C-alpha cells in the first residue's frame, strides 16, 4: 500500500480515541477487527459498507444515531473487540463457518443481509457501536470534529478530491 500524506495525523487522532477501549487502530485496506491483539483496521479509500451492508442494518436499528458512515464502520470493528469475550472459541468458529455459508449461498441480497446480521458476533458488535454512540454523543462528536478535517486534508494532499 502506498504511503498517503496525512495518514499519520489521522492514525494519531483515531488512536487517541480508541485508547480508551484498549484498542489500537491502523490504516488498512478494509475495516476489520483483530480481537486477539485488540487491533482494528480502517480504510479511507473505499466504501465502508462492508460485507452484508451493516450500515443499513445499523442505521435502521439506531435511527437516532446520526454518525458518519466511517464512524459506524470504525465503531462496529471496535465493538467486535469489546464483545469478543462473550463467545467461546467454538462459538467464534461457528460464526466464521456460518459467514462462509452465507457468502457462498445463492440467495438474494436481502436474505443474505438478514442472515449475516443475525450472526451473534455481528449483531452485538453493531449493538455495542450503536449503544456507545447513543450514550456518548458529545465524545463521539468531539472525536469526529477532529477527525473529519484531517481526513479531508489527507484527501486533498493526495489529490483524491
Q: How would you describe each model-predicted region?
A:
Residues 68-72, 76, 123-127:
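A structural signal for well-ordered alpha-helical segments within the folded catalytic domains
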Residues 1, 27-31, 103:
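Long, low-complexity, intrinsically disordered N-terminal extensions of eukaryotic proteins, enriched
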Residues 4-24:
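Zn2+-dependent metallopeptidase catalytic core
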